[in-house]
Amino acid sequence: LLLGCVQRCFDPSVSTATVKVLQANGFEVVIPADQGCCGAVSHHQGELELTRQLATDLVRSMNAVEGDLDAVLVAASGCGHTMKAYGELLNGKAAFRAPVLDVQEFLADRGLLESFRAQLQPLPGVVAMHDACHMIHGQGIQAQPRQLLRAIPDVQLREATEAGVCCGSAGIYNLVQPEEAAELGRIKADDLSSTGAELVASANIGCTL
């Protein structure tokens, strides 16, 4: 499991919860202690040489895991989008020995155990799903997060009218173009608010922040 630099700093509870869910569904989770940055931020900045070095180091770290490796999982879509592009970035010189998957596509594909479903507490209320650009456009993942959310008893999912519109984070766009990013954020917030949702679910730490 990749922890993600920004996620580790700003909301480590995401990784903690991810590990708990995976273990509760029968999966062994390995977190290499020497894992570094995936290179997403430097990639956004166009620093390709630094990105390639970070990517090479991360591949080495993940491939050093002992025993069978079914997947390299990511719980931040910005990281996952970059890691899935390593083949092109590294020109085939280094590659993970297992596929890179967002944790949601992994769980949706493998299925949730009935013992896990039985432990899920009801969440009465309306939830809107925010589709991160790096997930819906970059990785083609849209149905899986909704499938998992619907496993929660009593949850009501409502769709925003502009689900595919950027929230303004866009990698580092909110840092280099703060005014334009803030306007995109306002549009996104208005759209999500119009659903009447009490909660907004997001699968990317950049969007959440």
Model-derived features: where do they sit?
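Iron-sulfur cluster-binding electron-transfer modules in prokaryotic oxidoreductases
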Residues: 2-209
